[in-house]
Amino acid sequence: MLEGDEKQSRALDFNRLEVLSLLGRGAKGVVFLVRDDDAKLLALKVILKEAIEKKKKGRESEDDEYKRVSFEQGVLSRFDHPLFPSLHGVLATDKVIGYAIDYCPGQNLNSLRKMQSESMFSDEIIRFYAAELVLALDYLHNQGIVYRDLKPDNVMIQENGHLMLIDFDLSTNLAPRTPQPSPSLSKPSPTMKRKKRLFRFTSFCNSGISPQESISVHSSSTLAVSDSSGEKSNSFVGTEEYVAPEVISGDGHDFAVDWWSLGVVLYEMLYGATPFRGSNRKETFYRILSKPPNLTGETTSLRDLIRRLLEKDPSRRINVEEIKGHDFFRGVDWEKVILVSRPPYIPAPDDGGDKGTDVNTKMDVENIVQEIFAARQEREKQSGDNNKNANMKIKDNTSGEWVKGLNNNHDLESDNNFLVF
């Protein structure tokens, strides 16, 4: 599936973890900031077993839910790439299951965008982040993984300023797009990181995580077809504003859905809003299926790239080779992107500090996860709305060094950021 064998994941012991704070919550899990016995900060995702078991009364069976959790852990255990997290261990108790990955101390791409005075990035900043997203998706596709949930909330910014994709519970296996090997992309050494500079940036970058829930109406069958990927999935998954037309229409989908989602992400980075959002899900899906994106402004290579990514016919949508050769990326050395030493923004150092939390035992963690799950169930029962963002604040990490031209002005109210795995 992925390069290399699946690594044997070490078992995590609550007694050897220092729980520092509650980072946030999502539809399936609660995330804690922890410090292990090597003093390394980790993001610990904890899932209530009861939440998984309740799924068998809904759209998925209990076995399917456990398979998705197992799939995500398996994928994480195989990653050896600078744009993806490493799996640092797994845990299981009578009440919860969970795993720990790299902690990104800053904001996610969505939070970083909202920190701009007009909630938009410059073309130059977009170029850097877009190049890393292209590399990340290309890596997944060459390993036979369709991501299926690309959105700014799932794009973290690491402490070194480079991106990190998270949240693979909606991903799936297909036959690899092509048999061609990926370039060597194991995590670079610190000395390599210092050497190269690709873009005309003069300062450093930041890291993060955030919200928006994902549609998980699963019909997880796989249909063999004679195209470049070898097969298609008929599952209906994704986040509604980023989901591709072929997912909505149910015609089967492959790796091209990720390039559509990249187009939505780039549009949002440029304009400050997604291109097809309606007043409700039905209207949003109608616009995705029938309306062209409104690419206002002068004709630029970025707008042309977005237009080609948001081609509704997946067979005509721009592919990875065409993306890398597009005018928007003219002059980009794809072998050196991940070696750039000074990305647009780097967060202030975070050693975990004194978070002032009373969450420090296995019982505390289990109780908090149970309480959050119970409160969520009650809200859903009262409102009937399964798509509300979680109401958990995360700490303000807006300090850091910004490249010239990347505005750090932001509204204090925008600090109500959310973390969803």
Swiss-Prot record:
Activated in response to hydrogen peroxide and cellulase elicitor. Activated by PDK1 in a phosphatidic acid dependent manner. Its EC number is 2.7.11.1. InterPro entries: AGC-kinase_C, Kinase-like_dom_sf, Prot_kinase_dom, Ser/Thr_kinase_AS. Pfam families: Pkinase (PF00069). The modification Phosphoserine is found at S235. Residues 330-421 form the AGC-kinase C-terminal domain. It catalyses: L-seryl-[protein] + ATP = O-phospho-L-seryl-[protein] + ADP + H(+); L-threonyl-[protein] + ATP = O-phospho-L-threonyl-[protein] + ADP + H(+). Residues 167-246 are annotated as: Activation loop. PANTHER family: FLIPPASE KINASE 1-RELATED (PTHR45637). Changing F421A: Loss of interaction with PDPK1 and PDK2. ATP binds at L23, G24, R25, G26, A27, K28, G29, V30, V31, K45. Belongs to the protein kinase superfamily. AGC Ser/Thr protein kinase family. Changing S235A: Strongly reduces catalytic activity. Induction: By wounding, hydrogen peroxide and cellulase elicitor. Involved in oxidative burst-mediated signaling. Required for basal resistance to P.parasitica infection and root hair growth. Partly required for the activation of MPK3 and MPK6 by hydrogen peroxide and cellulase elicitor. This is Serine/threonine-protein kinase OXI1. Expressed in roots and root hair cells.
